[in-house]
Each structure stands twice: as C-alpha cells, then as structure tokens.
Amino acid sequence: MALPWYRVHTVVLNDPGRLISVHLMHTALVSGWAGSMALYELAVFDPSDPVLNPMWRQGMFVMPFMARLGVTDSWGGWSITGESVSNPGLWSFEGVALTHIVLSGLLFLASIWHWVYWDLDLFRDPRTLEPALDLPKVFGIHLVLSSLLCFGFGAFHVTGLFGPGIWISDAYGLTGRIQSVAPAWGPEGFNPFNPGGIASHHIAAGTVGILAGVFHLNVRPPQRLYRALRMGNIETVLSSSIAAVFFASFVVSGTMWYGAASTPIELFGPTRYQWDSGYFQQEIEKRVEESLSNGLSLPEAWSNIPDKLAFYDYIGNNPAKGGLFRAGPMNKGDGIAEAWLGHPVFQDKEGHELIVRRMPAFFENFPIILVDKDGIIRADIPFRRAESKYSIEQVGVTCSFYGGKLNNQSFKDASTVKKYARKAQFGEVFEFDRTILDSDGVFRSSPRGWFTFGHANFALLFFFGHLWHGSRTLFRDVFAGIGAEVTEQVEFGVFQKVGDKTTKKQGYV
C-alpha cells in the first residue's frame, strides 16, 4: 500500500523500536547540523575586530549560543572578547563542534541498531506478551532525566560550582564576559534581565520536575483520566510533546525579540526597542554631560565614549531594519564598519545648535530635518523641485565633529554638510567598507531577527500540529467509525469488531 507524503509517519505509530530509531536519526541530523554549521561559521568568521565587527554583524547563528554558555575561545588562538589564547582544549568552538559531529555519528549507529533490532522484549507486556508501552511510566522516566539535566545546569554550570558560568554583561553591552552567577531567590529573580534568575529558575524547575517524575513513576493515573486523555495512545504523546515545543518556541521568540539576560546584545545584537526608545542615545548624552560637569571640553567628553556604545546607537544594527527576504549578514548590507567618525553637531548662521531628526525603524526613506533644542525646524534637505526656504545653503548650516576619527574637525561646504546630515539620520556616524563583501547598501537583519522570525513561525505551525494530533487522538473512535451507540469497548486496530454486526449497541425504542 502506497502512502501519501503526509501519512508516512504511520509506519512507526505502533512500532516502538522503529519509533526510537527515527528519533535517534533525527537527533543525529540535528547534532550533525549543529557541529557542521559551527565549523562553517568558524571558517568564515573574522575575529579581528570584536567591537565594530562582532559575530552578530557577520551573521553568525550558532556561535552566539555557544558563547553565552561559556565557549569563547578558538583553536586558532583567538577569543571573541579580543584576547589571544593558547590551548583552549575541548571547551572551545572547534571542540564543541567536533563533539557534536562525533555524537551525531554515534546516534546514527544507534538508530541503525534500533531499526534492525526493533522487536525487543522491553516493548512487550510481560504478563500477556502483547506489544505494549507503559506511557505514563515512560513519561516519568523522561521527566526525571530532563529535570536532572535542568537542575544540574542551574546548580553547577551557571553558578560556576562545576562549570564556566554564563555570559554576563552590563545594561549597555560593553563589559561582557563569562562569569559565575549566584541564584536570585527573591522577587528580583523574576526580572528577565537579571541573570541570577536563570540559575534559580533552573534549580527550582529541576527540583519540581524531579519530584513530579518520581510521582509519575510511583502513582498510576486514575482509569477515568487514563481513558479520557487516551494515555495509552502514542499520538497523545506526540500531541502533548508538540504543545511543549510550541510553547517553548513562543517564549524564546519573546525573550530574543524583546531582549533578556539569556540573549545578550553583545552576542545577538541590540533589540529594535533600544533604537525606538533612544536607549543608547540617552546613555551617551548622560555620559557626555557627566564629563562636561567634571570640567572636560566637548571634544574630550565625546572622545571618552566607547566605540562599542556608539555603534549600538546606529540604525543599521536595528534587527527590524532588515527585510525578511534580504538574505545574508548585516555586513552584506551597509558594509563592514571600520571607524566611528564622531558625533556631528550642526549649527546655523544664527548660532542655533541643530540636531538631525532620526529615522523611525519602519521607514525606508525619511526627510532630512534639522531641529533646534525646542524642536523647531530650522533647516532641511528639500525634495527635488520643492520650494525651499530651509535648505542647508540658505540657512548656512555648518557641521562639527566631536570624538571619533574626525574629532574637532568642522565642515562648511554645503555638499559635505548634507552628506553628514544624511548619515546623522541613522544615529552615530560610521565609516563602512562596502567593497570587501560587495555590500549593496540595503540593511539586513541580525541573528536576533532571524531567530525570532523562525521560532515564531514554527511555533504557529506547531500550535496547529498540536490541535491536529490532539483532536485525532481524542476523537479517534469517531474518526474510525465507532459510533456513540456502541456500548462494547472497541478500539480501532486492536479488535476486528469495528462495524461488525455482533458488536453490542445501544438499542432505540
């Protein structure tokens, strides 16, 4: 009998041995992909400038996940923090990649073994010798094992008790490094930006899960509940597993897009809301004001701003600026950042200090408008053929730079002033090399954007998959043709009485 493509998985529905086999093969493929992808990323990754050319600008996808768990060094002698290292050993990018590839091979062999030796005594009821799985017991075993892993991660890996710790940084993504974390047991542990919550929540969830697993190993479900939720049917397992996966996928889509301690901006890039709210702009202005109050001059104050902080305050690093159909890393869009040119300050001939109104995230084009401190428009770059009374030439706008490569330089030429006004619309002004990667000048999204897009979409698909398989398992008797009038316990695929005249039915008067 030929099966259509969407029905092929029925061949493992009542075959536990081969069901294990295909799951082992799937895990082998995932592990092999992860290891191979890591090696590919290492082959194309340029570690030379961790400030202006970090991994998220280069479109690295699996490297940030390794880095946040404590893998920062390479056999090539470099570290993502910019230091040189020697003999990092197995706990390195290459070591983890090769470990995954070796694991993939072992899982592949295990899959073949289970496909060949599919009819194990383990899958038969010892009393009746009929094929049977004790699914509530299997659930208890899996819950205990996964909870032990969860508890161990929180209690040992994250805390540094037996492990490296995790990636910890300040609120502005400047001082990131691997360090151990103390669990946060108070209300502060519920702050998604508090890394202490990662440790405490894994310890708590692991503890609860271990207790729940022991419970399910020792306590049988009530018969009514067992039948109501079809606990003897493997499709119930599929349905509830899909529910767990899509829920987790929605959660991580949120923590990635909105930001959290588990998705640091140094590894995944800033969030769109940090551009929308002027998050980095406010911090830069605050630091400049503090420097000025300490007696420094304007050029000195701006020179104290780290390039890393200034680079975050640039619209090209906003993950919402990249279209979903623009493939490639951020560097393929605006180019490889080479230097911060400095902070441009504009002034008209009347002495008003002007700032360029910044482009909102969802605009592809936005008028170049220069406003004073009161928000009054003083100058602009008019559209072609438009009447102009605020043009750069008429208003006599000049541009001075503080900090960066052009520190303390001024420009009066109208074409140069216009050039920097256009750049200032995008935040802090940077110099990019677009020749190395043949960059096309069209913004791309960061790994933060791609991760969110992928997981939100798959979560939606899996949500419908949960409904589909849940309804199939709950209403299997109806779909199989066993009517409500049938009083004898019949199960499709077990008895041959479905539709049989001898099957007892409820009589009608």
Swiss-Prot record:
Gene3D superfamilies associated with the record: Photosystem II CP47 reaction center protein (3.10.680.10)
Task: State the compartments where it is located.
Answer: Plastid, Chloroplast thylakoid membrane
Can you cite an annotated GO cellular component?
chloroplast thylakoid membrane
One GO biological process this protein is involved in is: photosynthetic electron transport in photosystem II
List all membrane-crossing ranges: 21-36, 101-115, 140-156, 203-218, 237-252, 457-472
Spell out the disulfide connections: none
How does the record say this protein sits in the membrane?
A: Multi-pass membrane protein
Q: Which GO terms describe its molecular function?
A: chlorophyll binding; electron transporter, transferring electrons within the cyclic electron transport pathway of photosynthesis activity
Give the matching InterPro entries.
PS_antenna-like, PS_II_antenna-like_sf, PSII_PsbB
Give the Pfam families listed for this entry. PSII (PF00421)
User: What keywords are annotated for this sequence in UniProt?
Assistant: Chlorophyll, Chloroplast, Chromophore, Membrane, Photosynthesis, Photosystem II, Plastid, Thylakoid, Transmembrane, Transmembrane helix
Return the cofactor note field.
Binds multiple chlorophylls. PSII binds additional chlorophylls, carotenoids and specific lipids.
Q: What is its main location?
A: plastid
Subunit structure, interactors included:
PSII is composed of 1 copy each of membrane proteins PsbA, PsbB, PsbC, PsbD, PsbE, PsbF, PsbH, PsbI, PsbJ, PsbK, PsbL, PsbM, PsbT, PsbY, PsbZ, Psb30/Ycf12, at least 3 peripheral proteins of the oxygen-evolving complex and a large number of cofactors. It forms dimeric complexes.
Family (UniProt): Belongs to the PsbB/PsbC family. PsbB subfamily.
Under the heading NCBIfam families, the entry gives:
PS_II_CP47
Describe its function.
Answer: One of the components of the core complex of photosystem II (PSII). It binds chlorophyll and helps catalyze the primary light-induced photochemical processes of PSII. PSII is a light-driven water:plastoquinone oxidoreductase, using light energy to abstract electrons from H(2)O, generating O(2) and a proton gradient subsequently used for ATP formation.
Protein name per its UniProtKB record? Photosystem II CP47 reaction center protein
Taxonomy, top ranks, is: Eukaryota, Rhodophyta, Bangiophyceae, Cyanidiales, Cyanidiaceae
